[in-house]
Curated annotation (Swiss-Prot):
Disulfide bonds: none annotated. One of its GO terms (molecular function) is phosphoglycerate mutase activity. The keyword Plastid does not apply. Binds 2 manganese ions per subunit. Catalyzes the interconversion of 2-phosphoglycerate and 3-phosphoglycerate. This is 2,3-bisphosphoglycerate-independent phosphoglycerate mutase. Its EC number is 5.4.2.12. Belongs to the BPG-independent phosphoglycerate mutase family. The keyword GTP-binding does not apply. It catalyses: (2R)-2-phosphoglycerate = (2R)-3-phosphoglycerate. The lineage of its organism: Bacteria, Bacillati, Mycoplasmatota, Mycoplasmoidales, Mycoplasmoidaceae. The gene is gpmI. Monomer. Disruption phenotype: Probably essential, it was not disrupted in a global transposon mutagenesis study. It comes from Mycoplasma genitalium (strain ATCC 33530 / DSM 19775 / NCTC 10195 / G37) (Mycoplasmoides genitalium). Substrate binds at residues 122, 150-151, 182, 188, 257-260, 332.
Length: 507
């Protein structure tokens, strides 16, 4: 009987020896504890240069799944754009130059839309500053900024805005048109009611207005509203023609990570909402540029076209005529499909994709169990039918992002119950489970000043195998996972997979 493998990815489950504020250490999780302490386990580096990011940069779900699936270190987004800025090729980018040509021809504006954050997960402020430097020489530039509060401290927007306002003193033709939290402008779970509020602000319509952007943020803070949840507001000092999206304008969506940029991009460029809401009619003759490939969105140009990841783990499995399953809830479905397959939406032979709906709650600390039981129920019905399965549990990451320590404890304890069900099933059916994570989060929920922490970490993640005959090398990175699984399955590793297997005495 040939081997069957389940790769379970616990999103945001990092390892730290610290006790205080560490939901991973302090939750009652007997099954996970047993796996890490009593089965073959190695810690993997999931941040910085180990995953193709700048040194010291926190890992994230997109990069984590890319590296796991690719079997090589993948340089994307942040590192790629940083290098283009450093060597100045950024300022000669064809997509940007075409945008300038378009707005000069049409005497129109350029809108820079995206997450205003130094987190480096979806975007980076240095990229925005470079765009301002480039475009302000040629046209009026309008900024539409989404507050973060998840990948950085919950109330860091004010400080970043203060720095931006100083920077903008040298660029008088650049204005801040709108400000709002990513909760509204960067949804990825089809919550169109939220996204529509942010979109209408881009069109010049909002119940909230500001004369001073920093003053508006301060008022939000006074009302206990952190950066992520700031209600979209428009600049009261400008008429709508001066800042709102209009016909013939140029648009740059400067997020390099696609998953939370797709819905807003759809509203701007592809929306058919105007069929029953005429005021939302898509603007004509927009020149719309996305920093990277936003799957499902066809812009005028990509600033940085997608690189091809040839012979990913899923592709190798398919080429060997093996059946594979991908399963996750909505929040992480793109990660076990699009990102795991190298940043492309592909349909492989003998592949089944199963999407479990995420719960419709405002924030996941209100339902910390999320959809882990429903995922497990569906998984155990199907698992025996597949040679290779990729599973993602979102709880540690999504509840970790709320900064609610007690909710994260509950999330991990609910998850542990489902992990035990899976382990028991795998043992009974001769299926080997490899368990890992894409980055850390839940292991640092409170800082030394007793403040909640909502962002990812640079801590390592576990890589566990339920086959006790396995011996791992002592250290590794996420890219080692795919070669390890291929060797375990007795499948040849393609030359494109430059990382090595972690199985001892083998390459």
């Amino acid at each position: 009987m040939h081997k069957k493998v389940l790769l379970a990815i616990l999103d945001g489950y990092g390892i730290s020896n610290a006790i205080y504020g560490n939901a991973v250490q302090n939750a009652n999780t007997p099954m996970l504890d047993e796996l890490i302490n009593s089965y073959p386990c190695v810690l993997l580096d999931a941040s910085g240069e180990a995953v193709g990011l700048p040194m010291g940069q926190i890992g994230n779900s997109e990069v984590g799944h890319l590296n796991i699936g690719a079997g090589r270190v993948v340089y994307t987004g942040l590192s790629l754009i940083n290098q283009h800025i450093k060597d100045r090729s950024f300022f000669a980018n064809k997509a940007f130059l075409k945008t300038i040509e378009h707005v000069e021809k049409n005497h129109s504006k350029i809108h820079l839309i995206g997450l205003f954050s130094n987190g480096g997960v979806h975007s980076h402020n240095e990229h925005l500053l470079a765009l301002i430097e480039l475009f302000s020489k040629h046209a009026k530039v309008v900024l539409h900024l989404f507050g973060d509060g998840r990948d950085v401290a919950p109330c860091s927007l004010k400080q970043d805005l203060e720095k931006l306002m100083i920077f903008l003193k040298n660029y008088p033709n650049v204005v801040i048109g709108t400000i709002g939290g990513r909760y509204y402008g960067m949804d990825r779970d089809q919550r169109w009611d939220r996204e529509m509020i942010a979109y209408k602000a881009l069109l010049g319509v909002s119940k909230n207005k500001f004369n001073d952007p920093i003053g508006y943020i301060e008022t939000q803070y006074q009302n206990q509203i952190t950066d992520e949840f700031i209600y979209p507001a428009i600049n009261a000092n400008l008429n709508s023609d001066q800042f709102a999206l209009n016909n013939n304008d140029g648009v740059i969506f400067f997020n390099f990570r696609p998953d939370r940029a797709r819905q807003m991009s759809h509203l701007i460029f592809n929306s058919n909402y105007y069929n029953y809401q005429p005021e939302l009619k898509r603007k004509e003759n927009l020149f719309f540029v996305t920093m990277m490939n936003y799957e499902g969105i066809v812009p005028s140009e990509f600033a940085f076209p997608p690189q091809t990841i040839k012979n990913s783990l899923g592709e190798v499995i398919a080429n060997n005529n093996l059946k594979q399953l991908r399963i996750a809830e909505t929040e992480k479905y793109a990660h076990v499909t699009f990102f795991f397959d190298g940043g492309f939406e592909v349909n492989l032979s003998n592949e089944t994709k199963t999407l479990i709906p995420s719960l419709k709650v405002a924030t996941y600390d209100l339902a910390p169990e999320m959809s882990c039981k429903a995922i497990t129920d569906a998984l155990l019905e199907k698992l025996n039918n597949f040679d290779f399965t990729v599973l993602n549990f979102a709880n540690p990451d999504m509840v970790g992002h709320t900064g609610n320590y007690q909710a994260c404890i509950k999330a991990l304890e609910a998850l542990d119950v489902q992990i035990k069900r899976i382990v028991d099933f795998c043992k009974a059916n001769q299926i080997t489970m490899f368990l890992t994570a894409d980055h850390g989060n839940a292991e640092v929920m409170i800082d030394n000043n007793n403040n909640p922490v909502t962002k990812h970490t640079i801590n390592p993640v576990p890589f566990v195998c339920t086959d006790k005959n396995v011996n791992f090398n002592q250290t590794g990175i996420l890219a080692n996972i795919a070669p390890t699984i291929l060797e375990y399955l007795n499948l040849s590793k393609p030359k494109e997979m430059t990382a090595k297997s972690l199985l001892k005495n083998n390459n």
